[in-house]
């Protein structure tokens, strides 16, 4: 290396790791040597063999892999140094992660280095050196001195220390390494952000916006992240950090495909793309009142200033989900804003989380696809107007069948739609004591509800009065949606149950989809469902029932959608029923105008043989 230097103390360093165990006994092997100086023009040129190459000018020492010892080593020679390695591991996998884990500034000499692995091994036959000499650090140092500047520039590597958030486009170009640039990490703490992930993979080149935190079906972080690197070399080094620790949790790292990353990190929403394109610091707000406004959010964060963009998350029908994303211009403002976690807007406490562009895309995409799920596609088609052409039966004996319901309805059974009786089962596959019946029109449903409400049904020796309410197809769709989300197969008709061996019930925990199912308003004579957030571990079903039971309303059912833990509060859905007086008893037939009898010829069988259409609910 005939490099003319301006400082006599400038040095070259050849760094490698003593072994591949990376434990407390692993050391850095550092070989220090100095470049040759050009002779004066009046002197004869010096050949490489006659240049100063004695062993006294090439020294090797061991350095402990601790921040203190490494910093001390570089401070001994404060001038700039050229670092050479045989592969990226000493810099990218050992030294830079060492400083990142301890939240220390990376020394400037480590920001770039010369990787001579491919160049040096590729020239081993040309140089005429044996394998034993290649492994000798002194021999490698002498070979480096013989390389010219142009050859060395080809080996120059720059380490990108800072991670750059950015939106990922669907038409993003794929690099030369193709699909071998993505890994999946599991086991992240719930409070981990994209910057924690970047710290875990410090020293490796991550593409701008290449960290995509994954969300569960509820829209919450599930402890997984997909990371896209700029090269396969960085991805392979990332796999070596399998079972390393992040925030006291060990992380599992596996290979993943580029299509998996693109599915999570990209989206088709123009509004979301415009929001994340600002490259500001994103914070997610959860638990907002449904009528929350832009001004209330800005007041909530005062005296901090937000950017002009606030993204409210809504369902496809325009109803808000209680989530929003805001942006801060600086990291300092974002950290101050996160200190307002669990403060209130109105009567609701607000949860705050640092977010990413990929998380914004996932939440918006999930809300846009919620109404295209198989559960909704299979639901009973609801008309544009909310016609109450259904009736809901409550208090049925568990042994009740469709035939018992038809007998209970009496003359009103002739006004039931074909295959219009829907039994409701819980998530263990047992009858819930409820049923939905589709009538031919609203007048028939109203007359049926008024005519048989609080009448008695006899099943064997049991005799119970049945509550009958007029309902809409939307309520039926809601229960059908909840039932489809369970993974429990529908039970067989009761006629076959006697032939099956008894099975012990297998309770399953119910997890609702994100966003939460819609809430019906409280209407006298009907039921409503309330979603309760922030439930403490000490709160159970008895406490919820006691708190929400009033002279006007009674709690019919409590469904925990998330059990409270010491890390995360719980959520539950409460079913309330109005205790208002039932409608006055009137003549059912007087409320029906010009109802024609159904055409039994159109049925393939007798209308009383309604096939069982089970749906599941909690």
From Swiss-Prot:
Biased amino acid composition, Low complexity: 45-59
Domain RRM: 281-357, 389-473
Stored Gene3D superfamilies: 3.30.70.330
Subcellular location: Nucleus
Entry's Gene Ontology molecular function annotations: mRNA binding; RNA binding
The organism's place on the tree of life at top rank: Eukaryota
Entry GO terms, CC: nucleoplasm; ribonucleoprotein complex
Gene null: resulting phenotype: Worms lacking both symn-2 and mec-8 die during late embryogenesis. Lethality is probably due to defects in alternative splicing regulation.
Function: mRNA splicing factor that regulates alternative splicing of many genes in embryo. Probably plays a role in the formation of embryo-specific isoforms.
UniProt record similarity statement: Belongs to the ESRP family.
Protein name: RNA-binding protein sym-2
Species of provenance: Caenorhabditis elegans
């Amino acid at each position: 290396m005939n490099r003319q230097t301006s400082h006599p103390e400038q040095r070259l360093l050849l760094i490698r790791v003593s072994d591949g165990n990376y434990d407390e006994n692993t050391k850095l092997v550092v070989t220090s040597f100095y470049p040759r100086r050009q002779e004066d023009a009046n002197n004869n040129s010096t050949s490489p063999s006659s240049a100063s190459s004695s062993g006294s000018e090439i020294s090797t020492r061991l350095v402990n892999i601790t921040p203190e010892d490494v910093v001390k080593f570089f401070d001994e020679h404060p001038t700039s140094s050229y670092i050479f390695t045989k592969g990226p591991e000493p810099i990218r996998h050992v030294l830079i992660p060492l400083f990142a884990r301890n939240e220390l500034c990376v020394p400037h000499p480590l920001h770039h280095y010369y990787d001579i692995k491919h160049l040096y091994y590729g020239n081993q036959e040309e140089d005429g050196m044996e394998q034993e000499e290649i492994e000798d650090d002194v021999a490698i140092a002498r070979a480096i001195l013989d390389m010219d500047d142009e050859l060395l520039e080809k080996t120059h590597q720059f380490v990108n220390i800072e991670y750059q958030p950015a939106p990922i486009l669907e038409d993003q170009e794929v690099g030369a390494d193709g699909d071998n640039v993505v890994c999946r990490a599991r086991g992240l703490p719930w409070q981990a952000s994209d910057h924690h992930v970047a710290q875990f993979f410090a020293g490796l080149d991550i593409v701008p916006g290449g960290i995509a935190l994954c969300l569960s079906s509820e829209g919450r972080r599930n402890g997984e992240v997909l990371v896209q690197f700029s090269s396969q070399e960085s991805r392979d080094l990332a796999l070596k950090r399998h079972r390393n620790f992040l925030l006291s949790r060990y992380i599992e790292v596996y290979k993943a495909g580029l299509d998996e990353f693109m599915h999570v990190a990209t989206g088709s929403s123009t509004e979301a793309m415009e929001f994340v394109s600002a490259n500001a610091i994103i914070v997610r707000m959860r638990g907002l009142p449904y009528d929350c406004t832009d001004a209330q959010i800005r007041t909530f964060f005062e005296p901090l200033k937000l950017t002009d963009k606030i993204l409210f998350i809504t369902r496809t029908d325009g109803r808000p989900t209680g989530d929003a994303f805001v942006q801060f211009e600086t990291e300092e403002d974002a950290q101050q804003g996160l200190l307002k976690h669990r403060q209130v807007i109105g009567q609701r406490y607000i949860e705050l989380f640092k977010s990413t562009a990929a998380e914004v895309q996932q939440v918006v995409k999930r809300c846009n696809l919620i109404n295209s799920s198989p559960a909704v596609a299979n639901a009973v088609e609801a008309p544009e107007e909310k016609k109450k052409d259904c009736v809901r039966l409550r208090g049925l004996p568990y042994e009740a069948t469709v035939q018992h319901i038809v007998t209970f309805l009496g003359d009103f059974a002739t006004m039931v739609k074909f295959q219009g009786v829907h039994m409701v089962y819980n998530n263990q596959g047992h009858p819930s004591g409820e049923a939905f019946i589709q009538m031919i029109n609203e007048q028939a449903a109203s007359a049926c509800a008024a005519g048989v409400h609080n009448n008695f049904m006899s099943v064997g020796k049991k005799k119970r009065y049945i509550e009958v309410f007029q309902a809409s197809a939307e309520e039926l769709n809601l229960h059908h949606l909840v039932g489809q989300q369970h993974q429990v197969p529908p039970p067989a008709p009761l006629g076959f149950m006697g032939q099956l061996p008894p099975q012990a019930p297998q309770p399953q925990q119910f997890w609702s989809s994100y966003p939460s199912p819609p809430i019906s308003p409280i209407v006298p004579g009907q039921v409503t469902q309330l979603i309760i957030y922030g439930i403490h571990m000490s709160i159970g079903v008895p406490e919820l029932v006691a708190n929400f039971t009033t002279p006007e309303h009674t709690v019919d059912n409590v469904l925990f959608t998330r059990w409270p833990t010491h890390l995360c509060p719980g959520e539950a859905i409460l079913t309330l029923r109005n205790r208002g007086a039932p409608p006055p008893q009137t003549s059912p037939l007087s409320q029906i105008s010009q109802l024609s009898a159904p055409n039994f010829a159109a049925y393939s069988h007798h209308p009383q043989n309604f096939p069982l259409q089970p749906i599941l609910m909690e």
